[in-house]
Amino acid sequence: MVNNILKAPEGPPSDVEEIKEKSDYLRGTLKEVMLDRISAGIPDDDNRLMKHHGSYLQDDRDLRNERQKQKLEPAYQFMLRVRMPGGVSTPEQWLVMDELAQKYGNNTLKLTTRETFQMHGILKWNMKKTIQKINAALLDTIAACGDVNRNVMCASNPHQSEIHAEVYEWSKKLSDDLLPRTRAYHEIWLDEERVAGTPDTETEPMYGPLYLPRKFKIGIAVPPSNDIDVYSQDLGFIAIVEEGRLIGFNVAIGGGMGMTHGDTATYPQLSKVIGFCKPEQLYDVAEKTITIQRDYGNRSVRKNARFKYTVDRLGLENVKAELENRLGWQLDEAKPYHFDHNGDRYGWVKGVKGKWHFTMFIEGGRVTDYENYKLMTGLREIAKVHTGDFRLTSNQNLIIGNVSSQKKKQISALIEQYGLTDGRQHSALRRSSMACVALPTCGLAMAEAERYLPKLIDKIEDIVDENGLRDEEITIRMTGCPNGCARHALGEIGFIGKAPGKYNMYLGAAFDGSRLSKMYRENIGEEEILSELRTILPRYAKEREEGEHFGDFVIRAGIIKATTDGTNFHE
């Protein structure tokens, strides 16, 4: 029921809304076009629907100009993303993903900033068999992309405490219960026969035939770690623990990182805490929040369609009142909590029940075999003997989790044999870095990110070392476009691609993920970046207060103005 007080924005529906409306619940003509061998690509309308099945059509942009000269179509390929709530994979599932990446992908796995696997380079005629093998491993790609609830994140290591384990179970339940109900995925990819005559109301009781105006992201944090950047989520839950027992969750709404260059009506935003719910109320809060976005989100202008804009347009208190109206009960007052950081903690740690966990540093989240670093092979060999699990972190790293005391020696030997690392030989800056895929596969990228950030850090490390800052954690993030997949606006140093070799530089985000950055320099190249840091980092080394983080220092020192809300991000 739509509230008469709150108003949905006016305007004609976007072309994507029309595509969804005509799609027969995300079917479109995908089944037919995937059989077509004339082109390696698919029509744009079907590509818009393909997202909801966990995939995007891409092309190798390194080859684009040469193929145009040869009058060939782009080197089309598909990216495939797995739905994996909380980032948990069994060793058997890891081996399946490893095999598929070698057989059908580009011999790499990307560990994403939302705790899941991405595979790149899959050809159209290999898509169905790849998806079928993923499903046979008890994983899937449903709703990993698209205008639905995406992969539900949670604090990375559920086995470090009973609380983490409990929170992980809630993330799985949310992910499963908020899935689209259409059987399109199963019919197109898994050869399920369609059941005729299913009433529309039963097809998508929560989403409806148009699904959501844009993607929707949920994450659960366990203080004092904000590793999932809970304030960046459309809907964030903050676990509240009293006397070692999970009593419920603070509820935060309206976060999101994406924006559009040059359009100040778009901006990153942090969610705001509006109250507290008990664990058994979690799903009800999530479902009702999603239906508010379904009913009031902007379906006319997609760049203003995320839930953060809905909240800012309608007003936080009005959205809270509407949520409580739909719930039929009021949220309790938010409980106190505290975050220390939003990064990972590396190396071996002993958890509950005598189990061990090794958090390893994987630069850019890219699992592959390098010339002198057989990372993919090493992890494959560990997966063959490991009896615990793997945990993909929201900082693109990996936890070899739930290792028994009996297995620890064997796994430690493999870690040493293949040179797998907890990052201690790297600077804390590098260990705190994150980059999206960007070029050559992402169609939105305006500049390099994953391929370039390590090289830039090589040069920044010289400045860091000169100033005694090698062990100082400074979060640094780079994205190839303003969409924010690597949560650039929450990096103490952030870069957003503007053009090849050119970036907007941002400073001043909080180390615990509670404050956005602000643009410091626009459209600058490497020399200008390094020149700025040669000025700022020595000042930080000399003038900082005890325990003061870089993002706080640049504000106190007057180098950058604090961003107090996403609505003044561009000021």
Swiss-Prot record:
Signal peptide: none annotated. [4Fe-4S] cluster binds at residues 436, 442, 481, 485. Keywords: 4Fe-4S, Amino-acid biosynthesis, Cysteine biosynthesis, Heme, Iron, Iron-sulfur, Metal-binding, NADP, Oxidoreductase. One of its GO terms (biological process) is cysteine biosynthetic process. Pathway: Sulfur metabolism; hydrogen sulfide biosynthesis; hydrogen sulfide from sulfite (NADPH route): step 1/1. InterPro entries: CysI, NiRdtase/SiRdtase_haem-b_fer, Nit/Sulf_reduc_fer-like_dom_sf, NO2/SO3_Rdtase_4Fe4S_dom, NO2/SO3_Rdtase_4Fe4S_prot, NO2/SO3_Rdtase_4Fe4S_sf, NO2/SO3_Rdtase_FeS/sirohaem_BS, Ubiquitin-like_dom. One of its GO terms (cellular component) is sulfite reductase complex (NADPH). It catalyses: hydrogen sulfide + 3 NADP(+) + 3 H2O = sulfite + 3 NADPH + 4 H(+). SUPFAM superfamilies: Nitrite and sulphite reductase 4Fe-4S domain-like, Nitrite/Sulfite reductase N-terminal domain-like. Alpha(8)-beta(8). The alpha component is a flavoprotein, the beta component is a hemoprotein. This is Sulfite reductase [NADPH] hemoprotein beta-component. The gene is cysI.
